[in-house]
Amino acid sequence: VSLQHNHIVVHNHIGPKVEIEGNHTLLYSIFRNLIDNAINYAGENITIGIDNYMEDSEFYYFSFYDTGRGIEEEHLERIFDRFYRVNQGRSRKTGGSGLGLSIVKNAVLFHKGQITAKNRKDGGLEFIFSLRKKLF
């Protein structure tokens, strides 16, 4: 499954001066797993947006969203749990391992950040998270 195949547009609004201190592999896994999750579960003909919308002296604050179907409110508290699947009928072949968002959360926490998820009022799912700035 790919961006082109599903007619997905990505808007990257991360500024060129954003520098994050941390483990490259874990930082990559945050964005990769969020993108994979949107591709696999948000549906077709959607937009994915990535934005560092705010910063303070220690952290950058990011919004990662899609304009897809979102999820039922009852699942929001558990989507970061290991092996949790919104649709229990999914198998590893058809719906992943249930580890992607757990990996995202643990990678964010490893970098002293926080993450939360919410449904967007116009549809889709949004992840708000923080990552520590590179200190010079």
Region spans (language model):
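Short conserved segment of the HATPase_c
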Residues: 71-83
